[in-house]
C-alpha cells in the first residue's frame, strides 16, 4: 500500500493519519456528525498534494468486509460507495478492535502492563479495552478474530428489559 488515508471512527471522535511513502503522519482528532463523514474524507484527500489511492477505515461495529453498521452512530460505512465517491483504488474496512489487533506487533513492550507473570504456552491473545463501548478482539494461531462481544446483552441487562426496568433511573446494569 503506497499512499493511504487511515481513519478511526468512534462514537465521539474521528481520528485520521496519512501513510505516505512508508511513513505515518501525525494523528489528528476531530468531532464530526454522521452526515459530514464522506465530505470530511473528501476534504482530507483534496488537501493532500500526494495521490491517495487507499482508504482504511476502522469503526465500531459488525464488519462483513463490504460495510460496517456502526453500533454507536446512525451510520453505515459502505466500502464500494467510498471507493466510487472518493475515486479510490481500494477501501478496506476493519472493526475497531480488529485494527488494534493488527497494530499490536508495532507497540513497544513498555506499552504493556503485565498483570500476572507466567509462561505462555502459545501466542494466542485476547485484547480488551474501553472506548465508546467495550472492544474485544482475539488473535488465535496468528489469525485476527474481530468480535462484537462488547455489544452482547448481559444477563442483568436482559433481566431489566424483561421486567421493563431498563429505562428506570433506579436500576442500571454494568
Language-model-detected regions and their locations in the chain:
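A glycine- and small-aliphatic-rich helix-loop capping segment at beta-alpha/alpha-beta transitions
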Residues: 21, 73-76, 107-115, 141-147
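Glycine-rich phosphate-binding loop signature in dinucleotide/nucleotide-binding domains
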Residues: 47-51, 119-122
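Short beta-strand-loop/turn "lid" adjacent to the catalytic site in phosphate-handling enzymes
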Residues: 49-93, 98, 102-110, 127
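Glycine/GP-enriched mid-protein hinge/lid loop-to-helix segment characteristic of carbohydrate kinases
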Residues: 115-174
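Short glycine-rich, Thr/Ser-proximal phosphate-binding strand/loop in the N-terminal lobe
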Residues: 3-45, 144-158
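Two-metal-ion RNase H-like nuclease active-site motif
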Residues: 2-8, 125-130
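Short, acidic Gly/Pro/Ser/Thr-rich loop/turn segments
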Residues: 14, 62-64, 133-137
Amino acid at each position: 500500500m503506497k499512499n493511504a488515508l487511515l481513519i478511526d471512527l468512534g462514537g465521539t471522535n474521528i481520528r485520521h493519519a496519512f501513510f505516505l511513502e512508508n511513513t505515518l503522519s501525525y494523528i489528528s482528532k476531530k468531532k464530526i456528525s454522521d452526515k459530514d463523514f464522506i465530505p470530511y474524507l473528501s476534504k482530507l484527500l483534496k488537501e493532500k498534494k500526494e495521490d491517495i489511492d487507499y482508504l482504511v477505515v476502522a469503526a465500531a461495529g459488525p464488519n462483513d468486509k463490504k460495510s460496517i453498521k456502526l453500533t454507536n452512530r446512525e451510520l453505515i460505512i459502505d466500502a464500494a460507495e467510498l471507493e466510487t465517491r472518493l475515486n479510490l483504488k481500494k477501501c478496506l474496512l476493519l472493526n475497531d478492535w480488529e485494527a488494534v489487533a493488527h497494530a499490536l506487533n508495532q507497540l513497544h513492550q513498555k506499552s504493556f502492563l503485565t498483570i500476572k507473570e507466567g509462561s505462555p504456552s502459545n501466542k494466542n491473545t485476547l485484547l480488551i479495552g474501553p472506548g465508546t463501548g467495550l472492544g474485544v478482539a482475539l488473535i488465535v494461531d496468528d489469525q485476527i478474530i474481530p468480535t462484537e462481544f462488547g455489544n452482547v446483552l448481559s444477563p442483568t441487562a436482559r433481566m431489566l428489559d424483561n421486567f421493563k426496568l431498563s429505562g428506570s433511573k433506579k436500576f442500571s446494569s454494568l
